[in-house]
Amino acid sequence: LMQGTAIVISPLISLMKDQVDAAVENGIAAVFMNSSLDQREISDVYRRLKERQVKLLYIAPERFAMPQFTEMLKGIPLSLFAIDEAHCISEWGHDFRPDYLALSAIPALFPNVPIAAFTATATNASSPMHFLAMPLTLLMTIRPAPAPMK
């Protein structure tokens, strides 16, 4: 992994937990910060971040929209912003999860931190680049190969 903490923005608490568990199992210092944590646990995550003990931090877009959180991030070295399930930006952003649209502030707030977006289900119309209007360092859409013709 690169120097600093990578921020992974993920839509679901269960997905965060599964990915953090897998990372920790593989020796990577990963944590999540979401609404399932109490204030003591959140304070512990903040402490670990400030002490540079975290390589991967999983958050929901709602966490990124909190000014206190983004101010804290400015005080630690960041290696990457990774937007997981990036198709949610267009599918959920306008109605169900409006804080996905706040992610478009990443380049202005953190101009020297690379941004990557990952999805397996985006269509051309739901491309994260279209809705974020931000330069992505990497946009990865994985689609199944077409079935062979018989």
PLM feature segments, named:
Residues P135-L139, P144-P148:
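Short linear motifs in low-complexity or flexible loops
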Residues G4-I28, F32-L37, E41, A60-R63, ...:
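Conserved Walker A/P-loop ATP-binding site and its immediately adjacent core
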Residues G4-I7, A29, Q53-L57, P77-L80, ...:
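Loop/turn-to-beta-strand initiation segments
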Residues K74-G75, S79-L136:
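Post-DEXD/H (motif II) to motif III coupling segment of the RecA-like Helicase ATP-binding lobe
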Residues L37-L80, C88-H94:
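Conserved helix/coil segment N-terminal to the catalytic DExD/H
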Residues L1-M2, A23-E25, R47-R52, E71-I76, ...:
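Conserved catalytic network of the ASCE P-loop NTPase/AAA+ motor domain
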